[in-house]
């Protein structure tokens, strides 16, 4: 057996560790290095830079508390390897692929490097197919592409995580699909809640959970998205599955990269972000795609700092997305959830060649009415409804019904709202909005359109 390449720690600066290899054989960039203390505690670093004088600069994936200069470091000879395949379903892992649900992992299971190749053009699939989510506002106005990348944009507390949880629930229960949930720099409580909610809903055995929470070092938060992606890629490439990859929150991935960049001494670029922002984002996003063997559909929650969409972090994410779902505080203030702004959100799939002529026409009519309603808001605020023409009054009444009807009770929020969650098929969604647009429900009060499933629920409420 070959003797392992070993070095010694010569400097520790927070999560940055410098290691000198006297053998003259430096580990490659992105290799994983290990330190094991007599207490059996294991530390893992990733090589980030060769800084000269036989020394490598590494980023630690765990807290460096307990380390000291002079400790022996071992080069594993490969990148960070994480478990993949059936063994990860129903389980919860950290960035290094160690189980954190206090259950054992099978010995000798398959593992893959977190730094996988980007699929070539020949391997990629080029046709577009819609993924039905059962959420009316999404399916009608911002349809998601199977194998596409979707961004959920919103400030703090507008409902990004609840929307992600509902999507996981709907895909598992209605489509029997596999999901990988990656918690990047978010609250530990949310991960804990998600685990037990999914267990209670019976969808945990179709999901792998990977967490690098906000209390962990920046190295873990920067790499945990790649750990989740590696697990999803295995299902796509080796088991020919259609997989959903949820990343909550992609902004924290950028934020962790910014911290690491500063620790490595790089000069920051705009707004203090790392100069390699676009490169790091591209390396992650380009691996998320449909291939001839299967697809990875990615839903990424994107925190928008100070609700500013021009901030470099959300702006860089925008360029990779097929659909953007914008959650708006003003919609949430009206008590309408999911708090999606239908006029700010968009999808490249809303095209008659993809969704069909009927769906496209209904969606455009809904958008036109909501746009006209927005234009009339100032007149209504200053002069009141009485100054509007009869045609505009009709548009306002229908727009308010549509706005209320775009709300929907979620299964994962049942215990908070007390309203039974609903999954609405795309055909029912189109039929329901057609009824409102045609004026068949003009006599109905607008309040009964709130938190209904399909239009049949509204009619049943009216008849009561």
From Swiss-Prot:
Matching SMART domains: AAA
Molecular functions (GO terms): ATP binding; ATP hydrolysis activity; proton-transporting ATP synthase activity, rotational mechanism
Enzyme Commission number(s) from the entry: 7.1.2.2
Pfam families in the cross-refs: ATP-synt_ab (PF00006), ATP-synt_ab_N (PF02874), ATP-synt_VA_C (PF22919)
Membrane-topology descriptor: Peripheral membrane protein
Keyword annotations from UniProtKB, A to Z: ATP synthesis, ATP-binding, Cell membrane, CF(1), Hydrogen ion transport, Ion transport, Membrane, Nucleotide-binding, Translocase, Transport
Superkingdom, taxonomy of origin: Bacteria
GO CC annotation terms, alphabetical: plasma membrane; proton-transporting ATP synthase complex
Residues binding ATP, per UniProt: 154-161
Catalytic activity, reaction form: ATP + H2O + 4 H(+)(in) = ADP + phosphate + 5 H(+)(out)
Subcellular location: Cell membrane
Catalytic class of the enzyme: translocase
Keyword set includes Metal-binding: no
UniProt keyword annotation of ATP-binding present: yes
InterPro entries documented for this protein: AAA+_ATPase, ATP-synt_VA_C, ATP_synth_F1_bsu, ATPase_a/bsu_AS, ATPase_alpha/beta_chains, ATPase_F1/V1/A1_a/bsu_N, ATPase_F1/V1/A1_a/bsu_N_sf, ATPase_F1/V1/A1_a/bsu_nucl-bd
Family to which this protein belongs: Belongs to the ATPase alpha/beta chains family.
Subunit structure: F-type ATPases have 2 components, CF(1) - the catalytic core - and CF(0) - the membrane proton channel. CF(1) has five subunits: alpha(3), beta(3), gamma(1), delta(1), epsilon(1). CF(0) has three main subunits: a(1), b(2) and c(9-12). The alpha and beta chains form an alternating ring which encloses part of the gamma chain. CF(1) is attached to CF(0) by a central stalk formed by the gamma and epsilon chains, while a peripheral stalk is formed by the delta and b chains.
Entry-linked PANTHER family: ATP SYNTHASE (PTHR15184), ATP SYNTHASE SUBUNIT BETA, MITOCHONDRIAL (PTHR15184:SF71)
Biological role stated in the UniProt entry: Produces ATP from ADP in the presence of a proton gradient across the membrane. The catalytic sites are hosted primarily by the beta subunits.
Name the UniProt record assigns to this protein: ATP synthase subunit beta
Species per Swiss-Prot/TrEMBL record: Mycoplasmopsis synoviae (strain 53)
